[in-house]
Amino acid sequence: MNSVTVSHAPYTITYHDDWEPVMNQLVEFYNEVASWLLRDETSPIPDKFFIQLKQPLRNKRVCVCGIDPYPKDGTGVPFESPNFTKKSIKEIASSISRLTGVIDYKGYNLNIIDGVIPWNYYLSCKLGETKSHAIYWDKISKLLLHHITKHVSVLYCLGKTDFSNIRAKLESPVTTIVGYHPAARDRQFEKDRSFEIINVLLELDNKAPINWAQGFIY
């Protein structure tokens, strides 16, 4: 692991070698906006903004991307809910349960699945207010997601409205699926077959499928 310093909390960002090419720009962009976004109480706390940068990218095939952290109790790991109370991860687990037949589980975490990096486009929000920090993170968000897409085969974005123009923001030729948000009304996410489709797309790209059942916690 490597680390760099920034002028505001969290003061130090620890990161895996695979993120090295973007770190100078990240530091520059963060120092520009940190004083603005740190005026608010944030979810997650600043020490957890950059936790996912500890993840390697060279072994990832799929990025599962949400728009921003839970407005309360964000852990820095996208979709993670240690007490398994958040609707989004419960809906994701339910979808994977239908796909895999696994039923006796106590939780689900995308971050423990081989080949998958869960990501949030914006890395924080004001406590209780989703998408409230979008304007501050915008440059950093594009920089980091663009870097991720150089490594993965499939980018799966959750939220048809939030990600309607995501392809225009990407410079890498990555296969992109824009699906329903897990909390979408009329149970639209339930009918979404994206987790299956991802494995078909990986196969077409001569990559190993994702074992989605690995994410279950018992």
From Swiss-Prot:
The active site is at residue 68. GO terms for molecular function: DNA binding; uracil DNA N-glycosylase activity. Its EC number is 3.2.2.27. Keywords: DNA damage, DNA repair, DNA-binding, Hydrolase. InterPro entries: Ura-DNA_Glyclase_AS, Uracil-DNA_glycosylase-like_sf. It comes from the Viruses. Gene3D superfamilies: Uracil-DNA glycosylase-like domain (3.40.470.10). It catalyses: Hydrolyzes single-stranded DNA or mismatched double-stranded DNA and polynucleotides, releasing free uracil. Belongs to the uracil-DNA glycosylase (UDG) superfamily. UNG family. Plays an essential role in viral replication as a component of the DNA polymerase processivity factor. Excises uracil residues from the DNA which can arise as a result of misincorporation of dUMP residues by DNA polymerase or due to deamination of cytosine. This is Uracil-DNA glycosylase. It comes from Variola virus. The gene is OPG116.
